[in-house]
């Protein structure tokens, strides 16, 4: 069983306070979250927010986990082509600004998108940083399915659970609160494009209450493409509306 006390108190307090701003309570022992009845989300001052997930990687095609810098983060040919096609269709959205995350596969996705002349500037934002699986790189779901930390983070949805050098879901969501603060401060009334990871997309959906419960329709099998996903629609390099 995962012990939340292995995570520094300062980190747990930061996560708890940021999520509370969006009406989300965390059980301090189990790390589980839920919306607080009667609460609403703070005002979002931009006109719209969309997110493009990084291009498909070799890790995805091999059903392997990747960390921020592992060698399996290189893009597949299909991933590059899908992202280029999406980049060619961005004019219709009339974005004012693009914000992209700091890790190599996201930076490189941004480069693919900006290879085609766009009408917007792209700015790196450190807090647009999703799950980092350091310690689990190159492993499969089958390798990790009995790992207590993996069970806590991905199956029990414990917001504090992470590998010693990795990232928790709670920190990803807390970082997205800070990104929303940045958007409200600097991009009021603007159409904003984010370029980041699938976990960041889920974090924004949780904060902005796109489902009745934060983890409705989430499965670890779906998140990490467990089993034969040949015919499954993937959203790597594809745009999604957040707000």
Regions found by a protein language model. Name each.
Residues 2-118, 167:
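Active-site-proximal alpha-helix that buttresses catalytic centers in soluble enzyme cores
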Residues 59, 70-74, 115-175:
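Phosphate-handling substructures
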Residues 100-101, 174, 195-196:
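Short beta-strand scaffold positions
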Residues 50, 123-126, 240:
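General small-molecule cofactor/ligand-binding pocket signal
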Residues 49, 190-198:
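Generic beta-sheet signal
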Residues 89, 112-116, 182, 186, ...:
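Active-site catalytic microenvironments for nucleophilic, acid-base chemistry
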Residues 1-47, 131-143, 185-190, 205-243:
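Acidic, low-complexity terminal tails and accessory targeting/binding regions
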Residues 55, 198-199:
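Active-site metal-binding loops of divalent metal-dependent hydrolases
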């Amino acid at each position: 069983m995962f012990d939340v006390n292995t995570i520094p108190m300062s980190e747990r307090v930061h996560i708890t306070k940021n999520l509370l701003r969006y009406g989300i309570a965390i059980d301090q022992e189990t790390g589980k979250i839920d919306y607080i009845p009667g609460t609403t989300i703070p005002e979002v001052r931009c006109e719209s927010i969309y997110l493009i997930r990084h291009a498909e990687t070799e890790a995805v095609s091999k059903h392997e986990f990747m960390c921020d810098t592992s060698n399996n983060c290189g893009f597949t040919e299909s991933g590059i082509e899908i992202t280029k096609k999406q980049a060619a269709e961005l004019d219709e959205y009339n974005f004012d600004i693009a914000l992209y995350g700091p890790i190599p596969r996201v930076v490189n996705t941004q480069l693919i998108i900006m290879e085609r002349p766009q009408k917007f500037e792209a700015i790196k934002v450190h807090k647009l940083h999703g799950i980092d699986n350091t310690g689990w790189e190159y492993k499969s779901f089958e390798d990790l399915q009995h790992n207590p930390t993996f069970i806590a983070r991905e199956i029990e949805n414990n917001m504090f659970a992470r590998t010693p050098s990795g990232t928790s879901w709670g920190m990803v969501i807390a970082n997205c609160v800070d990104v929303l603060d940045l958007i409200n401060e600097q991009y009021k009334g603007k159409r904003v494009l984010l370029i980041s990871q699938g976990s960041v997309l889920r974090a924004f959906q949780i904060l902005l209450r796109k489902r009745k419960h934060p983890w409705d329709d989430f499965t670890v099998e779906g998140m990490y493409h467990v089993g034969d996903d040949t015919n499954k629609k993937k959203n790597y390099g594809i745009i999604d509306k957040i707000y």
